[in-house]
Amino acid sequence: MSALPGFTLAALLLNVSLAEANGLVLKKDLELKGSTVAGKEAPLFLTADRIDSTAVGIIEAAGRVEARQAGRNFFADWLRYDTRENSVQARGKVRLEQPALLVTGDSLDIDLDTYSGQLAAPVYRFVGQPGRGDAERIDFIDENNFSLADATYTTCSVEDEDWYLKIADLDIDRGRDVGTAHHASLRFLGVPILYTPWMSFPLGDARKSGILAPTIGTTERSGLDIVVPYYLNLAPNYDATLYPRLLSKRGVQLGGEFRYLLEDARGVNRVEYLDDSEAARTRWSVALNNSYRLNANTQAGMLFDRVSDDDYFRDLSNLISITSLSHLNREVWVTTQHAHWNAELRAQSFQTLQDSTASTPIAEPYARLPHARLGAAQTFGRFEFTLESEATRFAHPTKTEGTRVLAYPTLRMPLVNDYGFLTPQIGWHSTYYALDESAADDNIVRNLPIFSLDSGVVFDRPMRFSGVDFEQTLEPRVYYVYAPYRDQDDIPIFDTGLLDFSYAQMFTPNQFIGGDRINDANQLTVAVTSRFVEAESGLERLQVTLGQRYYFTPQRVTLPGVDPRSDNTTDLLAAVSGQITRDWRIDTAWQFDTQNGTVIRQNLGASYRPGPGRAINFGYRFIDQTTEQVDVSAQWPLGRRWYGMFRYNYSFQDDKLVEGLAGLEYNGGCWALRTVFQRLATKEDQSTDALFFQLELNGMGRLGSNPLDVLKQSVPGYRPSNEILPTP
């Protein structure tokens, strides 16, 4: 047999001894099986139990037929190849394999020059990702385009086809990575739940303009809540989303978000507008966040958050992190970072959101118009020099205004070896105030030295517990600081407050944060930490810490209205934390008044997470006379596919529920159903209820109101159920 025009019998060895009248019996060359040549001019590789040349230019193959060309593989019971037309006909158990798609059918007719043709009764499956379906036929238009008639699509298994998309005509354009469906209906458990006469969607992960899945929910304060986002893929590096929102009790809210990512700039900007019939006023929100890289060392940016009224977030959001906001930031800034110095220029102000039901108003922070900062660090042999300096103009509508200039150079000498460290440090804190005319003293100067000595050692030993090898450490630490008294009663409070007493705060020279107060200090902090580290994994199983501060002189510098300290010791601090087992973690801390024998502050936290979809969290927070809260949350399987979620955050001090949440989730294998009820305190004596109901179809999208952000924030360790059970 000679090679015919346009056709190559390759990957075959001819067994001449078996040649008979019935035709030639051919064997495969396994080394060449699966070989492909790119392009339309690539040869066709053919193998079969039987191959006949029935006429001039006609080749027929029967029995386990395999034909391969340029990455396309054809399998069938019978195949006819017309070398003159360069076309193929295949019948009986036809299978077409491509890199990302596998299709079976009854018959195939295709022109190998134009890739046009038809496959009858196709059943298709994507390779490497979920997704399958069938159709009445596939019409191949050219190399990149084909269409399916009367098609279906689903990510469900054949045994449990709970949902599928029914499409009258589906056009696929691989050149543009776009699919277009005509007269598509979504059926769930046999019931049509959604219909569209036309829809266009991207193939793969590419972005494409179009309507996104709507969200539907309900809240007590706003009623029925429907959002229909429209996505605009303007360019590969910037896009926009328009999200009209219908609130049955308030009206239609219009919102839009614009994002961009350039080589030297990025930003996210959002605006919202609502003509609120319930509040009888127009309401709006603006959030602008942009940053720019001016050169390798210098960046600039702006942040602008503003809303029309104090209750905007409380009325229109369901996230506690949003409804609890009290100050919105507005600032522009420029920073530069170099090897031994850095600088910053910033202008900043705030919008304060008041709670009309609160007994006391929220204090409005000072604006910094502007704020300039310079920092430096340099090493000279064993000595380390640092400089912190700033100049700020503080503005406020009702309080004393003025300018503060501050400089704090320090020199330290760290002495470190394998057993411990000793670090003496000396600094000079200098501050100048130029106040407005309403102040008692227009110009104030404050200078004082600050000396500290930090030291610690580390002891360790091997130990064995419950058959596991550990390394136990004992780490005592002693910290001394001295700063003389300076009268600061005439200095206003621009940005200064008292640091929360904590383990980290005990090793700082100043108990105040901000530059308006420098404490007088002659004090010694003594602490010890012990760690239990698993030898094989290096995992810290347990850490125990104790610490206390001792004062050698009475306190004289305080904040206005705060009495000075009378005791010569601080409260005792204790903390226990660690991953005590594979599933259990604890984080606890206590502040204990040794003079009166009472607990001043207490934080207890524990979490149990034996596996995905199994999480229990417990927290208790107590601050004497101000706070006492319990916080319990969990996600846990209730059956083979059922999961329950809840959170209970209660304030005993205020005798109210801060946040309550209860939800159920069902995993159907290729879909998930979630329903969540949430009650959230939005004001001192008010709360709002929200109901979420969402159907997620794997590989297709989500329908309904989205509770995922609420669940992930309210239930630490939460995992969507369809991320736990593998999709069939």
UniProtKB/Swiss-Prot annotation:
Q: What's the chief localization of this chain? A: membrane
- The answer to whether keyword Cell inner membrane applies is no
Top-rank lineage group of the source organism: Bacteria
Q: Which of UniProt's keywords are assigned here?
A: Cell outer membrane, Membrane, Signal
Where is the protein situated, by its record's location annotation?
A: Cell outer membrane
Known partners and oligomeric status: Component of the lipopolysaccharide transport and assembly complex. Interacts with LptE and LptA.
Name under which the protein is recorded: LPS-assembly protein LptD
